[in-house]
Amino acid sequence: MLKPLLIGASLAALLAGCSSHPAQPLDQRLLGEWQGTRDKNGPCQFFTWNSSFRADGRFEISFFADEQRTRLIQTERGTWTAHYGKNHLTTDGVKTTEVYDYRFVDADTVEYVSIKADPTADCQADYRFTEHRVGR
């Protein structure tokens, strides 16, 4: 009698330990290190950035005021998901999620178009940009 009860309790504990939310989808092609540059002649302030998308659903993006990436503006960290051509970025401490349409130009180049910007972002203009994989 005790053995079935222990098995049942163990199974219940195991199931309770599982997340009730499914794992968030991550487009595996986006994992890794990337670099981008905002258009110097575009509607928004010029800057460059390095971004890192990790398999644990975390991202880090460092923004620089120069092409050489020596004058750091700021670094943002947060969570990301990406699937079906949409990349969602939620920066730590910011309630609004930024959403981008994306498409691969080739295995190491991704084109993004902003469709939902963070209201605290430096530029609210719709814009597109390209990121290039680093170190491959």
Identify what each model region corresponds to.
Residues M1-A16:
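Sec-dependent bacterial lipoprotein signal peptides
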Residues C18-R77, H83-R136:
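Lipid interaction determinants
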